[in-house]
From Swiss-Prot:
Keywords: Autoinducer synthesis, Iron, Lyase, Metal-binding, Quorum sensing. This is S-ribosylhomocysteine lyase. GO terms for molecular function: iron ion binding; S-ribosylhomocysteine lyase activity. Belongs to the LuxS family. Fe cation binds at H54, H58, C128. Binds 1 Fe cation per subunit. The keyword Zinc does not apply. Involved in the synthesis of autoinducer 2 (AI-2) which is secreted by bacteria and is used to communicate both the cell density and the metabolic potential of the environment. The regulation of gene expression in response to changes in cell density is called quorum sensing. Catalyzes the transformation of S-ribosylhomocysteine (RHC) to homocysteine (HC) and 4,5-dihydroxy-2,3-pentadione (DPD).
Length: 169
């Protein structure tokens, strides 16, 4: 099985909250697609709550589009990581980490402004596979912790696992 890019970085040295360019590629027509690692929690030390990350998934996707989409950027997808330490965001364009971090902070402020659970988009059995597994309060706790901590940048050149380590795993 091929080694995926996300498993070539040292998770023991990742900072959180932090933005990292996980991958960048060009389409056959020359458009740039960038995948960002939006790391909310320090891997293997913290984890996002099940209900909190699910609610955040519904809110974050729209709020990030509000703050980041524009003439040169269009978000394709924002999805939670299976390890529940963050989200991957795929987009057309190549915004800087600082622009992404600013949009992320603004999106967290938007989460705090949601008053009632009924305001969560697609919160119904037709549009959500586990529509009863949500917590606006837990999503707000996550947002508050991100705002309080601020967002750093994780750089691949500082996190890349050596061939020696990879071959020994």
């Amino acid at each position: 099985m091929p080694l995926l890019d996300s498993f070539t970085v040292d998770h023991t040295r990742m900072n959180a909250p932090a933005v990292r360019v996980a991958k960048s590629m060009s389409t056959p027509k020359g458009d740039t697609i960038t995948v960002f690692d939006l790391r909310f929690c320090v891997p293997n030390k913290q984890i996002l709550s099940e209900r909190g990350i699910h609610t955040l998934e519904h809110l974050f996707a729209g709020f990030m589009r509000d703050h980041l989409n524009g003439d040169n950027v269009e978000i394709i997808d924002i999805s939670p990581m299976g390890c529940r330490t963050g989200f991957y965001m795929s987009l057309i364009g190549a915004p800087s980490e600082s622009i992404v971090a600013d949009a992320w902070l603004a999106a967290m402020q938007d989460v705090l402004a949601v008053v009632e659970q009924s305001e969560i988009p697609e919160l119904n059995e037709y549009q959500c596979g586990t529509y009863e597994m949500h917590s606006l309060e837990q999503a707000k706790e996550i947002a508050r912790s991100i705002i309080s901590a601020g967002i750093n940048v994780n750089r691949n050149d500082e996190l890349t696992l050596s061939d020696e380590i990879l071959n020994g795993l």
